[in-house]
Amino acid sequence: MQRSPLEKASVVSKLFFSWTRPILRKGYRQRLELSDIYQIPSADSADNLSEKLEREWDRELASKKNPKLINALRRCFFWRFMFYGILLYLGEVTKAVQPLLLGRIIASYDPDNKEERSIAIYLGIGLCLLFIVRTLLLHPAIFGLHHIGMQMRIAMFSLIYKKTLKLSSRVLDKISIGQLVSLLSNNLNKFDEGLALAHFVWIVPLQVALLMGLIWELLQASAFCGLGFLIVLALFQAGLGRMMMKYRDQRAGKINERLVITSEMIENIQSVKAYCWEEAMEKMIENLRQTELKLTRKAAYVRYFNSSAFFFSGFFVVFLSVLPYALIKGIVLRKIFTTISFCIVLRMAVTRQFPWAVQTWYDSLGAINKIQDFLQKQEYKTLEYNLTTTEVVMENVTAFWEEGFGELFEKAKQNNSNRKTSNDDDSLFFSNFSLLGTPVLKDINFKIERGQLLAVAGSTGAGKTSLLMMIMGELEPSEGKIKHSGRISFCSQFSWIMPGTIKENIIFGVSYDEYRYRSVINACQLEEDISKFAEKDNIVLGEGGITLSGGQRARISLARAVYKDADLYLLDSPFGYLDVLTEKEIFESCVCKLMANKTRILVTSKMEHLKKADKILILHEGSSYFYGTFSELQNLRPDFSSKLMGYDSFDQFSAERRNSILTETLRRFSLEGDAPVSWTETKKQSFKQTGEFGEKRKNSILNPINSIRKFSIVQKTPLQMNGIEEDSDEPLERRLSLVPDSEQGEVILPRISVISTGPTLQARRRQSVLNLMTHSVNQGQSIHRKTAASTRKVSLAPQANLTELDIYSRRLSQETGLEISEEINEEDLKECFFDDMESIPAVTTWNTYLRYITVHKSLIFVLIWCLVIFLAEVAASLVVLWFLGNTPPQDKGNSTYSRNNSYAVIITRTSSYYVFYIYVGVADTLLAMGFFRGLPLVHTLITVSKILHHKMLHSVLQAPMSTLNTLKAGGILNRFSKDIAILDDLLPLTIFDFIQLLLIVIGAIAVVAVLQPYIFVATVPVIVAFIMLRAYFLQTSQQLKQLESEGRSPIFTHLVTSLKGLWTLRAFGRQPYFETLFHKALNLHTANWFLYLSTLRWFQMRIEMIFVIFFIAVTFISILTTGEGEGTVGIILTLAMNIMSTLQWAVNSSIDVDSLMRSVSRVFKFIDMPTEEGKPTRSTKPYKNGQLSKVMVIENSHVKKDDIWPSGGQMTVKDLTAKYTEGGNPILENISFSISPGQRVGLLGRTGSGKSTLLSAFLRLLNTEGEIQIDGVSWDSITLQQWRKAFGVIPQKVFIFSGTFRKNLDPYEQWSDQEIWKVADEVGLRSVIEQFPGKLDFVLVDGGCVLSHGHKQLMCLARSVLSKAKILLLDEPSAHLDPVTYQIIRRTLKQAFADCTVILCEHRIEAMLECQQFLVIEENKVRQYDSIQKLLNERSLFQQAISPSDRVKLFPHRNSSKCKTQPQIAALKEETEEEVQDTRL
């Protein structure tokens, strides 16, 4: 970054913001880069600001029982805040004085006051000086308040982040990541720009008092008629605001539903294409979009009328103020024009500035209270340890995940023993206690000496991970003692990759040791992987390391743990994603050799690991089932395998767990009869044993970020799913959400995301930060993609302005959505932005406007209609202006005031009635036309948004994976959330405002030109100057705004990344390091934002300066050239003031339109994406009776029409080459082999060798060359969907979308309930589905969170059975499966797919042993394709991977003697992420 010119700028340069000229010049000439941005002043650095606020907050905490964050903020920022407030007030006072001077100028042209004509020029000078003073006061005040708001935001950002790193795991278990991001984005953005409006709470009352005093002098008591009308108008607008809020609340749920499905579709687009569900997903989303748009139109109409009421209220304010006085006493034109000017200022103050100020204070205080509550939450406490100890000891340790459950448990047992009966509430509490109150660990005892290896094994949910958490201090023991040295290194079960290079991920802030680093790389088998990258270990990993395979991520995480020099190494199932051979090598070289002298605790279920361990600890349901050596285990516990993992016992154990899951489901979900679904409230209910529901409680927490995460229940049946209110003395919202219920009644307009009715309680555990840390990489990496940006407030006052400050107020919400990407370093930051900067020009092109206008053919006619109506309004206005300026002299005898040649004076009752009849008639006409002029435009523009959404959705669904792979999931989702929200809400009214303002300016200029042609000459260069200034500024401002919005990404990415790896951070003690990285990201964003604010102020000040010059010219031209007639002078000066304020507004509005049209450009970019080859067609044909066929009838010229294809499943692959992107490096090269019908083929290869890629190539999801034939039909001769329908797929990443069981199994609704139940029986799903209310109509949400991983795999298996596919592709189907589900899948494969061709990619040897042929892939090519006997006889990868015990199983006749030896101990199963979550780790 460059050194800022601000540091050496003079006072004048700072006052006029001239120091920003270099960046404006550069931005106009070329595209700005991060290196062009200026460094921030030291006073704005996150380090200094956070230290300052943290010091005051600590002082507040130490001095008071009830600390207040606002007191700490006051001590930091109050005096500067008040100084700029006083400047703002003085600037606003000049607005009240200007009409006085205008009235005096008009009065000087009174024929009876010719002696005052000489002072008109001095009055004109005074009027111009007022504008100059106002400019010099207003802009520094606004900028100063912006600056303070920015500093407050930075300080609180840092304070919240530091607190987040200190929160206890129990607190994190109750807070969702969406709530944390919302706390930062939604609430803190209120300070950034809204602070400039806060002072109007006290400025407006003073201003109204001053104005009413001045109007009283003119009109006396009738002045209060206009004020009364304004108050009524404000109340009317408040009513419209509430109506708009009601529609928005109703619409919120529909938007949530649409974005739930859309986000799930985007995350699983590969599965959608593999299943051929494009049409089904498109239909589901479009149906939701239709309902959403109905409510969108209603909200838009109400908002339109709200805005129109302000525009056309000016007529009636003046009318009601002047009419009573005119009818009683008559009135001169000077008072009319002066009153008009006063009323303009008064109207803005009452209906705009004051409501905005009240809203700002309400929002700001609410945000401060939320942050204050968050900052007082319980912190993580490190355990006491002794650095001199060399052993790890745990004595009688018991622990609960639920805070305070240790005491509650003892109390509950005591109460239960004292009395046999209890009331309903107590029995409810105790009945649910087994689920929530059971200790996760109880009476654990072990001791290991230095250098020993302790292997921890056990069934799912036994407490293995919790044991490690307790050693690290994340889980506080309720009783017992833990003893260790405190120097800990940790490897998480789910690989955590931070943004940065591979080297940075491994070193992790520890001092670099070349020898140690190379030793770790070799031991963790990373050398070969690193050598494949051009940048070696300096390659940047983004989006959670998605450029790496799961095995590579796991090895990097292990290398990080091993690289740190510690006394105790905690390894939590580090080998889960590794193939068998790699796992063996790493265990030997890394765990057994490299760390031989270190104390290690390894969570594992592999028999080979147990044999090598010095001590073994087996946990079962939180208790110690066995502790000792392996030989002792065989002697003392020969039944341990069957006890824990035997299928008979496991069936019972699994049934108990399923009951627990069901109990939890029933606790979280309750049935709500046939009551209508209300998306504006989330009800929390108690599900008691009696079946009665607890009292409903409204909770309208608005959390747009969570709506992107997993928004809310997708309700498609009369069932209403609700959370449960758990028994607790503490208020539920305090325990479950850091965003309290204080946001009820907020009106929120979605920006990047959408309105949400708050995090549903049923998913709070799934959405908690603790769950985020225990989420698998494949699922966890999608969380940060879905985080969204800030929403904006829509105050009860409509969106309109007349002054620069009010224009600014309107821009209050023009925030570009926060989009999270992965990078911290400045050089690499641009590589991780969601939106490609190079593809979107800095300024919207004319082609985009033209294309947007022609999307809907009626839009052009609507624009013509608006123009015609406007011309009629101008004609009507000219009638009034002509009459006011040319009122004929009245008969002296009928005069109220006896004057000769008294022009433009209303004298008699007859003439006054005549004038006001015309005025009212014209006003009514204008009101009627104005109200309905824009409705067709708003309606049509929403229709255009509907069309663009449909086209974009269709384009994304039909785009090839090679194109989608180059896009970030968050970027795609932003198009459907942020950009569609802009097209729906902001763009229609902004375009209407701009068109209306532009026409008003044109009309006013025309009127002035008719009255005084010389002024028209001055107007032309001013308009040209405005246009040139706008073009000059727009180039730079849009680029700075883009850089600013992209600069937000690292902030929120860093937050999410830190939370995902929080246990690792704490174990390594790297909190200060990550705080430094967070401050660096904050400073980068601050540099962009501060420069944007400065250049914006430069532009606004230049507009004001041009306006002042123009007004000076108009004033002196009108004073010097106008002869007799005060009417002409009054009209010219009044219109001149209104022209320039309106033109200034129009210029700003045009910038807004250009900024919003960038969303249209991005949508068009997605619409123009290439499509996959072959247009999708219906793959089934109905029978004669109209029922859909259960098999696919091929539509191909090479096959007879009556043939059913595929019939056998024979598959031939010839010279297949696959690439991820067109022109990229081949992932697979020259693959050729043939599979016979009904054959089972296993794919073998190291992690990352291309096994899953080959399965994707079969489905034509990649760029492929070569040929594949199925039953003699080439893939080039049929459509894409017909080809994919030939395959059944069980993918590695299970896809469960939000919808009913029926929809998930049969989205096209081809099968009857009987057929679905039959298949559910075959795959073992019936018992699972029947446990849920509604059975097949039960709505699954949050990726099917109530189902275990195994049940989700069974869902995929059921889909394949229903598809009647002849070729089945299985990609790691048994990964993380329990034995019961695994046996069901094996049985189903043998029965339902007995005559099908099966291609299996699997790490479990026992599953591979059932295959007849094996395809070995190495270095992107086929190395071997033989039967199992040949592979075992040769030296191959398969021979190395298979163990002697597996050979015994495969060929028992070769080793008959060994069959009689001691029974082999089966391997314990790995735990799964879903099951870990269900059992609280």
From Swiss-Prot:
**Residues the record lists as binding ATP 1:** 401, 434, 458-465, 493
Q: Which residues cross the membrane?
A: 78-98, 123-146, 196-216, 223-243, 299-319, 340-358, 859-879, 919-939, 991-1011, 1014-1034, 1096-1116, 1131-1151
Give the domain section of the comments.
Binds and hydrolyzes ATP via the two cytoplasmic ABC transporter nucleotide-binding domains. The two ATP-binding domains interact with each other, forming a head-to-tail dimer. Normal ATPase activity requires interaction between the two domains. The first ABC transporter nucleotide-binding domain has no ATPase activity by itself.
Query: InterPro entries, per this entry?
Result: AAA+_ATPase, ABC1_TM_dom, ABC1_TM_sf, ABC_transporter-like_ATP-bd, ABC_transporter-like_CS, ABC_transporter_C-like, CFTR/ABCC7, CFTR1_ATP-bd_dom1
Leading EC class: isomerase
**Organism whose genome encodes this protein:** Macaca nemestrina
SMART domains in the record? AAA (SM00382)
Can you tell me which family this protein belongs to?
Belongs to the ABC transporter superfamily. ABCC family. CFTR transporter (TC 3.A.1.202) subfamily.
Q: How does it sit in the membrane?
A: Multi-pass membrane protein
Return one Gene Ontology term, BP aspect. sperm capacitation
Any idea which positions bind ATP 2?
1220, 1245-1252
Q: Where is this region: Disordered R region?
A: 654-831
Q: In terms of domain of life, where is this protein from?
A: Eukaryota
- Boundaries of each ABC transporter domain copy? 423-646, 1211-1444
- What residues bear Phosphothreonine in this entry? 717
The record's subcellular locations are:
Apical cell membrane; Early endosome membrane; Cell membrane; Recycling endosome membrane
The record's section on PANTHER family has: ATP-BINDING CASSETTE SUB-FAMILY C, CYSTIC FIBROSIS TRANSMEMBRANE CONDUCTANCE REGULATOR
Query: In its UniProt entry, what is this protein called?
Result: Cystic fibrosis transmembrane conductance regulator
Positions bearing Phosphoserine: 549, 660, 670, 686, 700, 712, 737, 753, 768, 790, 795, 813, 1445, 1457
- Key words of the record: ATP-binding, Cell membrane, Chloride, Chloride channel, Endoplasmic reticulum, Endosome, Glycoprotein, Ion channel, Ion transport, Isomerase, Isopeptide bond, Lipoprotein, Membrane, Nucleotide-binding, Nucleus, Palmitate, Phosphoprotein, Repeat, Transmembrane, Transmembrane helix, Transport, Ubl conjugation
Q: Where is this region: Interaction with GORASP2?
A: 1387-1481
Q: What are its E.C. numbers?
A: 5.6.1.6
One Pfam family hit: ABC_tran
Q: How does it assemble?
A: Monomer; does not require oligomerization for channel activity. May form oligomers in the membrane. Interacts with SLC26A3, SLC26A6 and NHERF1. Interacts with SHANK2. Interacts with MYO6. Interacts (via C-terminus) with GOPC (via PDZ domain); this promotes CFTR internalization and thereby decreases channel activity. Interacts with SLC4A7 through NHERF1. Found in a complex with MYO5B and RAB11A. Interacts with ANO1. Interacts with SLC26A8. Interacts with AHCYL1; the interaction increases CFTR activity. Interacts with CSE1L.
